[in-house]
UniProtKB/Swiss-Prot annotation:
Protein source organism: Shigella sonnei (strain Ss046)
Binding positions (ATP): 84, 86-87, 107, 119-120, 170, 177, 256
Catalytic residues identified in the record: 246 (proton acceptor)
Primary gene name: ydiU
Family named by the database record: Belongs to the SELO family.
Entry protein name: Protein nucleotidyltransferase YdiU
Record bears the keyword RNA-binding: no
């Protein structure tokens, strides 16, 4: 089958990019590809059998027209000016059978005009982390970019030490970022901001294109998508680590996996980025930061969208987030109906977990085994303060009895939203260390496991992390 590519970005937004081709690595070789995703995109298997090829920037497919995008943004709350694709190149936009498109973005593809002081490269460590994280999030049901392939090489890339150079093929319906809009707003080119908005509406919100109120309705949906995404992050214990405005997806996708982390111990103020000295991007601050970022996006639209309309959309953010978060947390607790004591029970559990430094994922998964008429719980042994747990657990069982549903039905619901497996940093690190020695077995094995996060397991993927694996510090270097 011949793949079809279109050039919408190149044709319609000529001032938002520089056209250039990838710079290949030395002795590049394909070490992993996403068979399931490739099948979904109708990519012929033969493309993965001819060396690094397009996956390593050595060749382009017919119809591809590579370019690096320019955007700007706020980083850690401070205006950073022009940024852009410093090591990534958009190879093309694949046209799918249903008429939608999928960006092929090659990360680590070499120097671009937006590399600033960087070398345009990515290291094997960071490409493995992003491939694992994006696929883990996808199978958890959270909107995200996807990973299609990883190429490693003999090219050394220098970070804290010399590391193997690598490339990741990332795919997404769009790489539109808040930072694209900021770039032209701060250059006082509001008409180009409007052109970006029109491009987004035309291709991703086409049902609004002929509506006289299209900009307000579109921005309201961007707010809602962002609120929903952040709510989902919070329910699975995901910390992004670097929520700069240039890392915010207009479509509400999880974008740019750098120093991310999933909670091990329940620690509301968890900071996964060792460069985040003030805790701006801590786990519990993510909802507030996302709203701040939306406010920056709204500012760029203010020359042609009424401020009252923008503020009305922003004012809806908290309620949308709380609604999505509340619905999912009630499911995690096994509540079928909504009762007034639900929030108090959840907050009491969180307080207990924080005091005891309980494992976030294991706690909710083990809670899924609760039988409402039994005082016994496998979770009890996870707590030192048994009296405090017993008191909470008695109230929790009483609440369960208000819903007329069998234990088996409720347990099935809970186990469908409380994963047994999340991508803990130590699991990724183990796969990385093996891969850097040339052994890809664990990389493939872990990818396979992450496809079934809600299935029961009895291996170390779902055990408590080892002491060395807790609070692994991760930097932005990639």
């Amino acid at each position: 089958m011949t793949l079809s590519f279109v050039t919408r970005w190149r044709d319609e937004l000529p001032e938002t990019y520089t056209a250039l081709s990838p710079t290949p690595l030395n002795n590049a070789r394909l070490i992993w590809h996403n068979t399931e995703l490739a099948n979904t995109l109708s990519i012929p298997s033969s493309l993965f059998k001819n060396g690094a090829g397009v996956w390593g920037g050595e060749a382009l497919l017919p119809g591809m027209s590579p370019l690096a995008q320019v955007y700007s943004g706020h980083q850690f709350g401070v205006w950073a000016g022009q940024l852009g694709d410093g090591r990534g190149i958009l190879l093309g936009e694949q046209l799918l059978a249903d008429g939608t498109t999928m960006d092929w973005h090659l990360k680590g593809a070499g120097l671009t005009p937006y590399s600033r002081m960087g070398d345009g490269r990515a290291v094997l460590r960071s490409t493995i982390r992003e491939s694992l994280a994006s696929e883990a999030m996808h199978y958890l049901g959270i909107p995200t970019t996807r990973a299609l392939s990883i190429v490693t090489s003999d090219s050394p890339v220098y970070r804290e030490t010399a590391e193997p150079g690598a490339m990741l093929m990332r795919v997404a319906p769009s790489h539109l970022r808040f930072g694209h809009f900021e770039h032209f707003y701060y250059r006082r080119e509001s008409e180009k901001v409007r052109q970006l908005a029109d491009f987004a509406i035309r291709h991703y919100w086409s049902h609004l294109e002929d509506d006289e109120d299209k900009y307000r309705l579109w921005f309201s949906d961007v707010v809602a998508r962002t609120a929903s995404l952040i709510a989902q992050w919070q329910t699975v214990g995901f910390a992004h680590g670097v929520m700069n405005t240039d890392n915010m997806s207009l479509l509400g996708l999880t974008l740019d996996y750098g120093p991310f982390g999933f909670l091990d111990d329940y620690e509301p103020g968890f900071i996964c980025n060792h460069s985040d000295h003030q805790g701006r991007y801590s786990f519990d601050n993510q909802p507030a930061v996302a709203l701040w970022n939306l406010q920056r996006l709204a500012q760029t639209l203010s020359p042609f969208v009424a401020v009252d309309a923008l503020n009305e959309a922003l004012d809806s953010y908290q309620q949308v987030l709380l609604t999505h978060y509340g619905q999912r947390m009630r499911q995690k607790l096994g509540f079928i109906t909504e009762q007034k004591e639900d929030n108090a029970l959840l907050n009491e559990l969180f307080s207990l977990m924080a005091r005891e430094r309980s494992d976030y994922t294991r706690t909710f998964r083990m809670l899924s085994l609760t039988e409402q008429h039994s005082t016994a719980s496998p979770l009890r042994d996870e707590f030192i303060d048994r009296a405090a747990f017993d008191g909470w657990f008695a109230r929790y069982r009483g609440r369960l009895q208000q819903d007329e549903v069998s234990d088996s039905e409720r347990q099935q619901l809970m186990q469908s939203v409380n994963p047994a497996l999340v991508l803990r940093n130590w699991l990724a690190q183990r796969a990385i260390e093996a891969a850097e020695k040339g052994d890809m077995t664990e990389l493939h094995r872990l990818h396979g496991a992450l496809r079934n996060p809600f299935s029961d397991r009895d291996d170390d993927y779902v055990s408590r992390p080892p002491d060395w694996g807790k609070r692994l510090e991760v930097s932005c270097s990639s």
